[in-house]
Every structure is written in structure tokens, then in C-alpha cells.
Curated annotation (Swiss-Prot):
UniProt organism field: Homo sapiens (Human)
Gene3D superfamilies in the cross-refs: 3.30.70.330
GO CC list: cytoplasm; nucleus
Lineage top rank: taxon: Eukaryota
Record's keyword terms, sorted: Cytoplasm, Differentiation, Meiosis, Oogenesis, Repeat, RNA-binding, Spermatogenesis
Stated name of the protein: Probable RNA-binding protein 46
Domain RRM as annotated: residue spans: 61-139, 141-223, 236-308
SMART domains, alphabetized: RRM
GO molecular function: mRNA binding
Quaternary data: Interacts with YTHDC2, MEIOC, MOV10, CNOT6L, DDX4, UPF1 and PABPC1.
Family annotation (InterPro entries): HnRNP_R/Q_splicing_fac (IPR006535), Nucleotide-bd_a/b_plait_sf (IPR012677), RBD_domain_sf (IPR035979), RBM46_DSR (IPR044462), RBM46_RRM1 (IPR034434), RBM46_RRM2 (IPR034435), RBM46_RRM3 (IPR047837), RRM_dom (IPR000504)
């Protein structure tokens, strides 16, 4: 059967066959001199371009392109993106059917060209009524490694990771807030390339891999967001980490004022890090060079310029559930509460998307409200007649999942315990009767929550991820470049496989691990029909 598409060069309904598509691509290659090859579900145009000498362009030169019409190909797309500058490589994600997957990555030869592409082509009308989205692509080269023995030093972790994975460049380890001789139980491992990081993740992700006798947790770390040089030139706030919990704001202000009395405007400290605000940038830069590596109350501190946060990107980061080695910096500088990757943390929202595979991330679907006018015609429907991308709550997704598989609704069992400081902590156990006698009799996360809503949401997230359920399987905007091909199944039944899972850090209210010696106490059965979400 011939492939057909509408020619977007003039907006007419001009039908092109597969042979014509092939001819158009060959003509593009002949005209530009670029090579084209298809591998691993993507078609690469260039990389490098003709006559290129030297290494590939640095990070920050690539953009992500979303919402591409599925029947549009390089012969139409490349000329559009060449308007911003010289293309080093154009990667179009492809389906087995021959259609594209709705998104692509364009690498330019300079960062300036990439920024220009974002400015002039984001929300560009590529065809009548069809607008593409263009944003920076973050080439993720870092993995989060959790459940590391706290007594291990950076050198030991680096040596061990080099033994079990290839391409390790560095390891980032932060000391404990309460005991500087120990680490925080996690580390960030940086690899020489995204491919090396992806291969390492594939090797370590099953949940059975152990280091020093401990089963480790592995996930993508959110790469640190790059802030343009013009913005950074205006920053007059320093980010100070590795402070003692007992160190006061007054002590920090006094120490940073030593090199120039009166230079510090104010200090905001949260746990073991702080933001030091200066009256002018010159004093901030001078203080950074003087104070970095200095000791305050016996702790050697790290001092850098604070990165101003992009509120939209931070919100998107919360929705994605991504973890960043500098997340404290980005979130708190925007007057948010503190975040601790994969451990105790406070973030303002529950996640809308829980797939931990983010590298790079397409733009999220915007959640909107619309005016409800008097007289608007309404039609009663069942929630089960909707598609899964209409839901954001994991509790709703789990109920939907069970219904689509003709299973009985999930059963939620609530447990509680009391923390050392007297707080009531909650956790749900979920039983799915249809598979209770199978390989997994129940699902229960190893984190405790302080609110009922968070406990129920976390348990549902954990269960869905164990069931290998993709939250946005029907939404083209949710496709991730590193996601595996979805399991096939009948239209009425969602595919099910049970698998071990080291789940990512969830932006929930503060959670506490079950592995803290506490005894689970009171049990309460909550009907699945109760509206706790």
C-alpha cells in the first residue's frame, strides 16, 4: 500500500506516494550533500554535514521539535529549520509504518543558531492550522543512583561505577546534612555521552543489580538547565551548599561580609544550603572566589552563582518528576520549598506524568479551564468512555486500567505509624483481586506520607509502574525518545506485565522510608469509591 501525505509546501491537498516521498528525500540529499541513514527508530540527516572537521557542536546547540504532522518529512522540514542557521544533524523519529512519530531533534553548529531557531520557529505554522513547538533539547548524560551505603566516599563510588558501566566521567556526591563524614545515600553519575548513560541505565535498571550488597535505585537525573549568559551577568545572588544544619543565617552573613563589610544584603538558609544576596554583582563575584572551599562551623562549603529559575520550566520539571543535582538551587531561588532528590522533600504539586524516562523531554500538554456558559449543552458520559490521557491522577489511571482489563476495582488498605517527632505517617497497600494469586499479591511503596491524598496517589503510582503501564499511551505529546515500543494488545485490553521497579522521586508531600525501624500500626480499609483524590 502506498504511503500518502498532503504536501505542505503550498497547503494544497496534493497526494504523495511512498515513491514520491523517497524521490523527494533523494533530491534533498543531492541538493545539500548531506547523508541520510535510518537506525534505532530514527532517521538521521547529516551528523556531520559535508566538509565538517573537528568534534560535534557542544551542548546547547540542539533543539527539540514537537507537534510535527505525521506525514511531513525532511524535504519539508529541513528548509524551514535552515532559516535559523547551518544544521549539523537533523534526527526525525520514525514509526515502523513509515510515518514520523511527531517529533524531531535539530542540532545546529552554534548555540546562537539554536536560540534563534527557538525564537523564530516556536509556534510556527508549518501547515495551515498546524503549529510546531520548538524548545531547547537537554542531552542528558547523568544518572541518579540511589540506596548507596552512606559510608562510601566519592572515590569508592567512582571506582565501582567504572567497573560496572562504561564511559563514566565523574560522580557527584553530597555529604549528609547532619554528618559530613557520610554521604546522603545517593549520587549522580556523569557519562561521556547520552548513549553511554542510556546503556548504563539499561544495565542497572532491572532492580536486581547490587553494589556493595545493596540493591540500588537507578533513574535519569534531570540535566541542569542552562541559563543564557546575558541573564547570568545580572545575577548577584550566591548559592552556598554543604553548610552545617546548626549554622545560622547571622553566621553566614558575618562570614561573607568579612571580605567587604556591608556587602551582603540578606541571607536565606534552608537546611544545609543558603542563598546570599548582595547589593551589587561585583561584590557577589568577588565573594564567590574568596569563599568557595572555605570552612564555616567546620564544614567546607561550595559557592556558585545562583541560577535564576524559569517558572514555566520549574513547573514542567515538577510535573515530569525529574531529579536534578542542583534542584535545590532552581526551586528555592523561586521561593519554593526545599527538594531532596529521591529522599525527603517538599514540592507543591502531585505529578501529572510519572514515566521516569526523560531525555530530552517534549513539552507537556497544557492543562486549561474554559468558560462554562449558561445554556451549554451537556451530555452524560462514563469516565471509562474517555481516553487515558484525560486523567492526571494515578488513582484514576489505576481504576481505568483495571476496568479496561475487565478486572475488579483495586482495593486500598491504609496503614499508619508514628514518627519519632510524633507525626502520623500513612501508607497504602493495594490489592488487585484479578492478579492477587499471581506473581505479585499486593503492591506497597516503601515511602510513608503525611497526608492521605499523597499516600493514596503514591501507592497508585507505584502499582501502575509495577504493572508497566504507560500513563499517556494515546498522547503523541507524551512520547519520549528513549521510551521502548509499547506492548501490543487488543483494543479493549491494556497489556499487563509485572516487573520489579526502582521508582523515581515523586513530587509529593514529605515522605519517609518504611525502612526506618518503625512498626506499621493501625489498619483501615478504605473503599475504592471514596473521593480522596
Amino acid at each position: 500500500m502506498n504511503e500518502e501525505n498532503i504536501d505542505g509546501t503550498n497547503g494544497c491537498s496534493k497526494v504523495r506516494t511512498g515513491i514520491q516521498n523517497e524521490a523527494a528525500l533523494l533530491a534533498l540529499m543531492e541538493k545539500t550533500g548531506y547523508n541520510m541513514v535510518q537506525e534505532n527508530g530514527q532517521r538521521k540527516f547529516g551528523g556531520p554535514p559535508p566538509g565538517w572537521e573537528g568534534p560535534p557542536p557542544p551542548r546547547g546547540c540542539e533543539v527539540f521539535v514537537g507537534k510535527i504532522p505525521r506525514d511531513m518529512y525532511e524535504d519539508e522540514l529541513v528548509p524551514v529549520f535552515e532559516r535559523a542557521g547551518k544544521i549539523y544533524e537533523f534526527r526525525l523519529m520514525m514509526e515502523f509504518s513509515g510515518e514520523n512519530r511527531g517529533y524531531a531533534f535539530v542540532m545546529y553548529t552554534t548555540k546562537e543558531e539554536a536560540q534563534l531557531a527557538i525564537r523564530i520557529l516556536n509556534n510556527y505554522e508549518i501547515r495551515p492550522g498546524k503549529f510546531i513547538g520548538v524548545c531547547v533539547s537537554l542531552d542528558n548524560c547523568r544518572l541518579f543512583i540511589g540506596a548507596i551505603p552512606k559510608e562510601k566516599k566519592k572515590e569508592e563510588i567512582l571506582d565501582e561505577m567504572k567497573k560496572v558501566t562504561e564511559g563514566v566521567v565523574d560522580v557527584i556526591v553530597y555529604p549528609s546534612a547532619t554528618d559530613k563524614t557520610k554521604n546522603r545515600g545517593f549520587a549522580f553519575v556523569e557519562y561521556e555521552s547520552h548513549r553511554a548513560a542510556a546503556m548504563a541505565r539499561r544495565k542497572l535498571i532491572p532492580g536486581t543489580f547490587q553494589l556493595w550488597g545493596h540493591t540500588i535505585q537507578v533513574d535519569w537525573a534531570d540535566p541542569e538547565k542552562e541559563v543564557d549568559e546575558e541573564t547570568m551577568q545580572r545575577v548577584k545572588v550566591l548559592y552556598v551548599r554543604n553548610l552545617m544544619i546548626s549554622t545560622t543565617e547571622e553566621t553566614i552573613k558575618a562570614e561573607f561580609n568579612k571580605f567587604k563589610p556591608g556587602a551582603v544584603e540578606r541571607v536565606k538558609k534552608l537546611r544545609d544550603y543558603a542563598f546570599v544576596h548582595f547589593f551589587n554583582r561585583e561584590d557577589a563575584v568577588a565573594a564567590m572566589s574568596v569563599m568557595n572551599g572555605k570552612c564555616i562551623d567546620g564544614a567546607s562549603i561550595e559557592v556558585t552563582l545562583a541560577k535564576p529559575v524559569n517558572k514555566e520550566n520549574t513547573w514542567r520539571q515538577h510535573l515530569n518528576g525529574q531529579i536534578s543535582p542542583n534542584s535545590e538551587n532552581l526551586i528555592v531561588f523561586a521561593n519554593k520549598e526545599e527538594s531532596h532528590p529521591k529522599t525527603l522533600g517538599k514540592l507543591p504539586t502531585l505529578p501529572a506524568r510519572l514515566n521516569g524516562q526523560h531525555s530530552p523531554s517534549p513539552p507537556e500538554v497544557e492543562r486549561c479551564t474554559y468558560p462554562f456558559y449558561p445554556g451549554t449543552k451537556l451530555t452524560p458520559i462514563s469516565m471509562y468512555s474517555l481516553k487515558s490521557n484525560h486523567f492526571n491522577s494515578a488513582v484514576m489511571h489505576l481504576d481505568y486500567y483495571c476496568n479496561k482489563n475487565n478486572w475488579a476495582p483495586p482495593e486500598y488498605y491504609l496503614y499508619s505509624t508514628t514518627s519519632q517527632d510524633g507525626k502520623v505517617l500513612l501508607v497504602y497497600k493495594i490489592v488487585i483481586p484479578a492478579i492477587a494469586n499471581g506473581s505479585q499479591s499486593y503492591f506497597m511503596p516503601d515511602k510513608l506520607c503525611t497526608t492521605l491524598e499523597d499516600a493514596k496517589e503514591l501507592a497508585a503510582q507505584f502499582t501502575l509502574l509495577h504493572l508497566d503501564y504507560n500513563f499517556h499511551r494515546s498522547s503523541i505529546n507524551s512520547l519520549s525518545p528513549v521510551s521502548a515500543t509499547l506492548s501490543s494488545g487488543t483494543p479493549s485490553v491494556l497489556p499487563y506485565t509485572s516487573r520489579p521497579y526502582s521508582y523515581p522521586g515523586y513530587p509529593l508531600s514529605p515522605t519517609i522510608s518504611l525502612a526506618n525501624g518503625s512498626h506499621v500500626g493501625q489498619r483501615l480499609c478504605i473503599s475504592n469509591q471514596a473521593s480522596f483524590f
